[in-house]
């Protein structure tokens, strides 16, 4: 479980399960040599995209500008799922994209503080690894995305084929 400090105390998402104080998510972590971190970051993003494709949820990928990155991240992507039932972010019509995943390349920020190192075979020295993380699914938000994108005319929800084997 994760906890959000401000949790519905202000802003536009104070009702429902879109933005709650306590939420669950499945996260991926990688520890790699510095020269491999760029490629690993793209690999984590590709896993997140494959999952969205498997569910048939429309989405977009945003590369976050440096001014919006947290102090630890050197590069970050967000995946936003299309939520057709939400009010439009432009104020006209229905539907908007909302973040369901992110992946960050934190380079040495965390490993230096935690003293996580590997022995560099070229130098024989212990050097900091690069750390990366990516959200596989933010559970509540993915439930919203599935419900809104898979609702049938009669109000029922058609479970995506990729999940059918897990539902009884």
Where are these regions (language model features)?
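TRNA-recognition modules of translation machinery and tRNA-sensing kinases, especially anticodon-binding
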Residues: 1-168
């Amino acid at each position: 479980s994760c906890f959000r400090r401000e949790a519905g105390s202000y802003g536009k998402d104070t009702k429902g399960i879109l933005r709650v104080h306590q939420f669950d998510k499945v996260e991926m972590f990688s520890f790699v040599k510095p020269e491999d971190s760029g490629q690993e970051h793209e690999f984590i993003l590709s896993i997140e995209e494959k999952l969205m494709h498997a569910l048939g949820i429309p989405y977009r990928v945003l590369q976050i500008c440096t001014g919006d990155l947290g102090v630890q991240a050197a590069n970050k992507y967000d995946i936003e799922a299309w939520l057709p039932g939400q009010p439009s972010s432009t104020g006209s019509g229905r539907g908007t994209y909302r973040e369901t995943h992110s992946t960050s390349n934190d380079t040495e920020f965390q490993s230096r503080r935690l003293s996580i190192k590997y022995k560099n075979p070229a130098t024989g020295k212990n050097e900091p690894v690069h750390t990366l993380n990516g959200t596989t699914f933010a559970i509540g938000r993915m439930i919203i995305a599935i419900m809104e994108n898979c609702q049938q005319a009669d109000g029922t929800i058609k479970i995506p084929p990729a999940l059918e084997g897990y539902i009884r």
